[in-house]
Amino acid sequence: MARVKRGVTTHARHKKILKLAKGYRGRAKSCYRIALQRVEKALQYAYRDRRTRKRDFRSLWIIRINAAAREHGLTYGRFMHGLTLAGIDLNRKILAEMAVNYKDDFAKLVETVSGKLAESS
């Protein structure tokens, strides 16, 4: 039976890790064992932060909507409640976009919501 040497696969694996570690500082970019540790940690951070990013953006959208709503005399909670009463189904991402880039349209939306809130109370 022929002897199997694993030089080719080992070299390929090392190359793959060192390619992923490109741009790292110090020996983390050139020494396989250290690069492997740094790459594994980087992948853990990436996995975690893909989930964190969703939370961060939702928070950012809420902050922007709240700021824009308060300029028109409503709080975020009252504004969102008014949207529900008015039957307007816009998500927070779109509302934040409107609040930042389409201020006139957002103002009209606040007027509509204010009317619905006045009717309900």
UniProtKB/Swiss-Prot annotation:
It comes from the Bacteria. One of its GO terms (biological process) is translation. GO terms for molecular function: rRNA binding; structural constituent of ribosome. CDD domains: Ribosomal_L20. Gene3D superfamilies: 6.10.160.10, Ribosomal protein L20. Pfam families: Ribosomal_L20 (PF00453). GO terms for cellular component: ribonucleoprotein complex; ribosome. InterPro entries: Ribosomal_bL20, RIBOSOMAL_L20_CS, Ribosomal_protein_bL20_C. Keywords: Ribonucleoprotein, Ribosomal protein, RNA-binding, rRNA-binding. Belongs to the bacterial ribosomal protein bL20 family. Binds directly to 23S ribosomal RNA and is necessary for the in vitro assembly process of the 50S ribosomal subunit. It is not involved in the protein synthesizing functions of that subunit. PANTHER family: 39S RIBOSOMAL PROTEIN L20 (PTHR10986). This is Large ribosomal subunit protein bL20. It comes from Wolbachia pipientis wMel.
